[in-house]
Amino acid sequence: MLVLSRKKNESIMIGDTIEIKIISIDGDQIKLGIDAPRNLDVYRKEIFDAIQEENRLAMKSQSDWASMKQLFQTSKEKRDDQ
């Protein structure tokens, strides 16, 4: 991890298109300004983690639905054979 020190109104660049600027410092809280291309999603870490968890749960649900569908098809085939 790269660790940098910056003061108010100073910034860092990530690549050619992303600028992160220190807007204000108030005690232990720092306000950042992020200038990035619109096609790049920018999230707070806790929001990003929540989105990832929801995606994992959705994938599990899709897998569960596929298993349930197979179960019902097998059951229907058995009834049709009788």
UniProtKB/Swiss-Prot annotation:
Biological processes per GO annotation: bacterial-type flagellum organization; mRNA catabolic process; negative regulation of translational initiation; regulation of bacterial-type flagellum assembly; regulation of carbohydrate metabolic process
Alphabetized Gene3D superfamilies for the sequence: Translational regulator CsrA
Cystine crosslinks: none
GO-annotated molecular function: mRNA 5'-UTR binding
UniProt cross-references to InterPro entries, sorted A to Z: CsrA, CsrA_sf
Keywords: Bacterial flagellum biogenesis, Cytoplasm, Repressor, RNA-binding, Translation regulation
Family: Belongs to the CsrA/RsmA family.
Quaternary assembly: Homodimer; the beta-strands of each monomer intercalate to form a hydrophobic core, while the alpha-helices form wings that extend away from the core.
UniProt function note: A translational regulator that binds mRNA to regulate translation initiation and/or mRNA stability. Usually binds in the 5'-UTR at or near the Shine-Dalgarno sequence preventing ribosome-binding, thus repressing translation. Its main target seems to be the major flagellin gene, while its function is anatagonized by FliW.
HAMAP family per the UniProt record, alphabetical: CsrA
UniProt protein name: Translational regulator CsrA
Organism encoding this protein: Brevibacillus brevis (strain 47 / JCM 6285 / NBRC 100599)
The gene coding this protein: csrA
